[in-house]
Amino acid sequence: MEVHNATSFLGHGGMAQHLQPVLESPFAESILALTPLQGIALFLCLFWGYSSLTLHRRIKVPGAPVHGYWSWLEPTWLLQLRYAKDAHKIIASGYKRYNVNGKPFVLRRQDLDITVLPTKYVAELRTIPNAKLSRGKANFMEWGDQWAMKNLWSHIDLPIKVISENRHGQQGKYLEAMRKEFEHAMEVEMPQVDDWTAVDIQKIIQMILARMVGKMIVGKEACRSPEWLDLAEHFTEDFVGASIIMRMLPKWTHPLVTNLLPQRWRMRRRLRDAVNITNPCVTRHREAREKRAKGIEVDYEDNMVGWMLDNAPDKQYVLDHLPILILIILVPAAHTTAMGISNLLFHLCEYPEWGAKLLKEINDVNNEFGPIGERLPAKDWVTKLDLLDSFFNESQRLSQPLSITPNRYAVEDFTFKDGLHIPKGALLGWVSIHNQIDPKIAPDPDTFDPLRSYRKRQVSAEENAKHLAGQPSLENLTFGYGSQACPGRNIAITVLKMILSRILRDYEFKFGDGQARPQNIYLLEFIIPDPKAKLMVRKREASVS
């Protein structure tokens, strides 16, 4: 058998001559003599050694200890490894040990540190401008960084404005457009079955939302195209998957790893393909504007692409970055809403006695005000569903998508009113699962109580306007808090109730024989429903044609 050494693979040219002294050095000979197992061990030692050296560069908030060590003997690299699967427990115990007593603590991830502040500081977020504590920059750090999100992110605030702006009633227009598309989505996506059938309900809800949200963002023609449906179904999966991987790696590895991830390859490809969606949208919008300017009626519904083109201070920037901008809107709009609906259905199957109560409320509202959108616009119709609102609040309390939210990035040095100093560059977060573990926030927190919010609203007229789904409060941080709370929360809650009021009226759901509520998956700060979970579904007898 022919034997090769390192130099035989370099040829006999100049490169081999230059490298010959290096390859023949005692150090190189020692490296080349290592077994594969020894080589892996050496690599890991160098990897974690360099990672440890970079820890001193992390921004430190005075008085905030690192939490999560088993003991003082545990090395930091082991804590960082454990954090991937134990984050939920570490966050909960840190809240009880420090936050309850008014003190901050630090979560030490592989890529960065998060300083977790007590809930008392949340109230100040209302008055702190984005220029000091930024949600946008925090999201950029959490969902990647300049390497992970290169060419896949835009710091322009136009996607936030297009969702939150309502000067000309465009939110109502968007909801009406989505309501119409919902009818088509139900016909295409929901199974028309009279007998109990096992279905992937999460996938079904995801695709219904992909069509509805697509109608709002890119319009009717685009939202039904195979290109859009593929983008909506798979881009978010790769986006979240890439983010999870990057969070589990030291930041110094990101420039190397970002180009090796298959998720990143697929994201880039779909971003290029998105041009085939946005270019026709731009053309249709331009043609509709020209005809309207001439007084010609056109069959064209306003959408978010058109709003951005009409209202952007730099139209050319929008044209150049439109695929990125629509994806920034799509990812949170469809993904988290689908999770919320799926979790509610899981809870309803776990507590089936509530099915008849929710159905009665839906039928009563339907009988009094007609079908949604007929006599009342969607945003007003769904406000009549008080019991469904409270049921969703409780379901979301126990199945939130993230255990740390809101987040803020310190753009500059900042000091809270009580003197807590936050240095520039610090990443801040709050424990959003506090209402799962703190009896002072939610009495008997382990109990599923669908009337928890409903009872609070009955106390007084003032309280009746509070404790609503999607309404940020010190007790409910799921949608953030303050002036930078989730801008699309009202649209999301309206769409969620729109979908649930229809499918609960038309369909029955239950677990399969021997099946219980699927367990959530905890990974880093993410709380994810079991993607393999299925439900049994059939059309209600009154709905069977």
From Swiss-Prot:
What is one cellular component GO term in this UniProt entry? Answer: membrane
Task: Give any GO molecular function from the UniProt entry.
Answer: monooxygenase activity
Pfam families to which the protein is assigned, alphabetical? p450
**UniProt topology in membrane:** Multi-pass membrane protein
Q: Which residues form the signal peptide?
A: none
Q: Which InterPro entries match?
A: Cyt_P450, Cyt_P450_E_grp-IV, Cyt_P450_sf
Which pathway does the database say it acts in?
Antibiotic biosynthesis
State where heme binds: 486
- Enumerate the Gene Ontology biological process terms: antibiotic biosynthetic process; secondary metabolic process
Looking up SUPFAM superfamilies in the UniProt record yields: Cytochrome P450
Q: Which cofactor does it need?
A: heme
Q: Which compartments does it reside in?
A: Membrane
The EC number(s) given in the record are 1.-.-.-
Q: Which residues are glycosylated?
A: 5, 276, 393, 476
Keyword set for this entry?
Antibiotic biosynthesis, Glycoprotein, Heme, Iron, Membrane, Metal-binding, Monooxygenase, Oxidoreductase, Transmembrane, Transmembrane helix
> Can you tell me which family this protein belongs to?
Belongs to the cytochrome P450 family.
What is the stated purpose of this protein? Answer: Cytochrome P450 monooxygenase; part of the gene cluster that mediates the biosynthesis of sordarin and hypoxysordarin, glycoside antibiotics with a unique tetracyclic diterpene aglycone structure. First, the geranylgeranyl diphosphate synthase sdnC constructs GGDP from farnesyl diphosphate and isopentenyl diphosphate. The diterpene cyclase sdnA then catalyzes the cyclization of GGDP to afford cycloaraneosene.
Q: What is this protein called?
A: Cytochrome P450 monooxygenase sdnB
> From which source organism is this entry?
Sordaria araneosa (Pleurage araneosa)
